[in-house]
Design a protein with these regions (language model features):
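Secreted, disulfide-rich extracellular signaling modules
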Residues: 1-326
Length: 326
């Protein structure tokens, strides 16, 4: 690590994110430029842990909203993510880079892992904001982000990597998703107190990353064996229980079918035309022993027993709250 007794020279500061194109799914328009900007947080995101809310409409506290630390415009094509050992990066503002490099050179105590809270107070974090005109989703794992300071001394180069910012927190609450949108006319007046029933509009609004909808690709069993009969097919989901939570799960969840473009094509039904639901099963003696059970036998048999020739028909379902304006 360089110090004030050395003549190391600052080069750059980068925010690096790993991306393995073979395991990630890019959704949307990957043929046009998509723009992403990085900002520094001025304070922690406002959060009331005593009265947590599903949505927090507080303004995100940024150091300089009019001046991003970095701007990256890219086409989200596979070759973009297969270079440099499946890593891509934002080159951040040099003023911030020199500020952090100064901490490194004087070996400031806030860089000691034992003083993690001091560093969090000094450097609240970074946020990546997609442009409002973006038409694609870029899945970035916040736990894999790394902040790197690059420097050199003569012909020798060096890199100082800060701990992942989420690692400074004692829980995953520090990694968060900020969603901003302008609702269409149809949904402009919808709120928790003024919902729009699913049955009225026959529409479901999906918000990924918030736990409302789960897309599931079902395993495929070929129908090439005419002597095999599928008697029962069920999906069993076990809610993850946190000790500090006391929020009751809904008693039912609903299942939707998707087309090959991942668009909702309708509600899943059985052979009698009845909607298929998942029902919450609880154990009064063991609070943590609870699960949703969804019977999809009719659907599965209809998909794999009609002469697919052993070709996987891509069985995708969407599971979410039953008829709620999410």
């Amino acid at each position: 690590i360089p110090n004030y007794d050395d003549n190391y020279v600052y080069d750059s500061l980068t925010l690096v994110f790993p991306f393995n194109a073979s395991t990630k799914i890019l959704a949307g328009d990957t043929a046009t430029l998509q723009t992403y900007r990085v900002y520094r947080l001025k304070n922690f995101p406002p959060t009331d842990f005593d009265d947590p809310s599903i949505y927090n409409n507080e303004t995100l506290p940024l150091y300089a909203p009019e001046k991003p630390l970095a701007t990256l415009s890219v086409k989200l094509e596979k070759q973009f993510f297969t270079q440099n050992n499946n890593e891509r990066y934002f080159k951040l503002d040099d003023d911030l880079g020199r500020e952090l490099f100064s901490l490194i050179r004087r070996q400031d105590s806030i860089l000691d892992p034992n003083n993690a809270l001091d560093f969090m107070r000094y450097f609240a974090g970074l946020t990546i904001v997609p442009d409002k005109d973006n038409m694609a989703l870029l899945p970035i794992d916040g736990s894999g982000l790394s902040l790197r300071c690059h420097y050199h001394l003569d012909v020798n180069t060096g890199t100082y990597t800060f701990r992942p910012l989420a690692a400074y927190a004692s829980g995953g609450y520090y990694a968060f998703t900020n969603i901003e949108h302008s609702p269409s006319v149809r949904f402009s007046n919808v709120s928790w107190n003024n919902p729009l029933p699913y049955s009225n509009e026959n529409k479901a609004v999906i918000q990924g990353q918030n736990g409302y909808m789960l897309k599931m690709k079902l395993p495929f069993k070929s129908d090439v064996n005419p002597y095999r009969t599928i008697l029962k097919v069920e999906i069993v989901l076990e809610p993850k229980i946190d000790n500090f939570e006391d929020i009751p799960e809904p008693t039912t969840i609903q299942v939707f079918t998707l087309d090959k473009y991942s668009r909702i094509s309708g509600k899943l039904t059985d052979l009698s035309g009845n909607s298929v639901f998942g029902y919450l099963e609880t154990n009064p003696n063991y609070k943590e022993d609870r699960k949703y059970r969804i019977d999809i036998t009719d659907y599965y048999n209809s998909m794999v027993s009609n002469g697919t020739g052993g070709i996987d028909p891509e069985l995708n379902l969407l599971i979410g709250l039953a008829g709620s304006p999410v």
